[in-house]
Amino acid sequence: MDKREIFVKMASIEERIGDLYKEIGELKDVIVVLMEENAQLLVENQHLRNRLDRKKTGSQAKQKGTSPVAKEKAKKAVVGEGYDNLARLYAEGFHICNVHFGSLRKEGDCLFCLSFLSGGPQK
């Protein structure tokens, strides 16, 4: 092989590597979109389950005649559970702040999310 052939092959390899790099970037973007959609669906699924549980609990409470104190404790338990779910989502790498809610955290910790988490569940 002469120098020209080697140079042409290197240029060809460089071009293929560039194309592969572009394709990897596109696949990465698709994965980010799918992960965000998955997180949104997980949150929606959890909300629907909570709603179903409340509906079941409400119909059982009507039958049993639950006291107001028990109803207040149930409300506080739901709030604590929601906070735990948001903390779990943040730990999995998603924003829980009102600025970027549900999107994937790409650059480490988010101050808005951390300020929300540091406030803890409101009593």
From Swiss-Prot:
Zn(2+) binds at residues 95, 97, 110, 113. Its cofactor is Zn(2+). It is found in: Cytoplasm, Nucleoid. One of its GO terms (cellular component) is nucleoid. Keywords: Cytoplasm, DNA replication, DNA replication inhibitor, Metal-binding, Zinc. Residues 52-72 are annotated as: Disordered. Its main location: cytoplasm. InterPro entries: YabA. This is Replication initiation control protein YabA. It comes from Brevibacillus brevis (strain 47 / JCM 6285 / NBRC 100599).
